[in-house]
Amino acid sequence: MCGVEHRFQIYKAILANGERLVLSLFSSQSGHSVRRSLHKVLYAIDGPAFDASCHPQRPIMTDKLRLAILELLEGRSLSVDLMHSAIGEIMDGRSTEVEIASLLTALRCRGESVNELVGAAQAMRERATSIPCRTINLLDTCGTGGDSLHTFNISTGAALVAAAAGQPVAKHGNRSVSSSTGSADVLEALGVNLQLTPNHIANCIDTVGIGFCFAPLLHGAMKYAAPVRKQLGIRTIFNLLGPLTNPAQASFQLVGASRVSSAELLAQALHKLGTQRALVVCGNDELDEVSLWGVTTVFEVSCEGVQCQTWTASELGLDPCRVEDLQVSNAAESAAILRNVFAGAKGPTRDILVANAAAALLAANRAESIRTAIPLAAAAIDTGRAARLCEWLIKFTRERA
């Protein structure tokens, strides 16, 4: 076997076993060995002696993507422009799965920076299908997910309550990756039709006061990274990009993150991206929502910068609860909780919905403080407005099936 053929067989083996190779990097205790392993991957798929003519259907690693990976392997963070180019090449289908996995793994090993988030978000925003709403000053409650606590879908319930309180909402979201239920899962379980065109979503927002921006339908370029994300089964930078890439360009955001460090990173990125106003919250350094146990860390984003504060259940005027009071096994259970709360059920599930809906209303400048936002959220539930809006959303979307 000639040298070129031998190297091509090495490449095919790496491509066929890319998942195993990349995942094996995480078992290493040495950052040096991680870098060495990834260098081997890069050499095998893009080494100077490799003849791409042996496999003409395979796109050659682009200069920007290769440079980005090599910079990360040396422990350096990427500029906004370089990250923008690298993610753009991935989302334009100009990279292989092994190359994508190499970039995502290198980012994860070193930890994503603010500039990297900003550059990636800009590339993703440019390729998103926009929602042509007439309504302005929209709110989004999309969080990062991935807290693995298996609570019911609090952020989606909070979006419905905020909309029932009069705040227009463009809820961005997807199906579950690591939790029991994602926003798409629970809305589908409630009976909402997710398969709407961008014009229908805009009409839903303008008419009902809330619409769901189903990420796979509006971020078509993500299809190139999706198989790699699924095979890796770990958190990557794409988990952080959902809250930064609302297709309706929401002016206000309530963003949940499962770690305080991630919350601060997102807050700084939102500020750099020019977000009008956002609250980025992390409950007790484990929940990607406002929590009613421990302390919720809140990063307030405005044009002036980012400020940090903390909330507790007692400061919100609500009873504390345990995570066990909020856990579900599937989307059907999550939907049942929302229906029960909207029908008047009291207890921890209602309280945490009130807390998060109040935070959403505060983020949208509908209240002066979290304490004054609490009764607004509670009234939207207690008067039956949340239940009626939920049924209207279901009916409206089904009529456009």
Segments (PLM) and residue ranges:
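Intrinsically disordered, low-complexity serine/threonine-rich segments
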Residues: 3, 13, 27-34
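Aromatic (phenylalanine/tyrosine) cluster motif
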Residues: 8-11, 26, 43, 50
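Active-site cofactor/substrate anionic-group-binding motifs, chiefly glycine-
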Residues: 111-170
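Short glycine/serine/threonine-rich phosphate/pyrophosphate-binding segments
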Residues: 147-159, 172, 177-181, 222, ...
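Glycine-rich anion-binding loops and their surrounding alpha/beta cores
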Residues: 63-67, 71, 77-78, 126-129, ...
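N-terminal glycine-rich anion-binding loops that anchor highly charged ligand groups
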Residues: 62-64, 70-116, 126-133, 352-353
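Active-site-proximal loop->helix
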Residues: 176-192
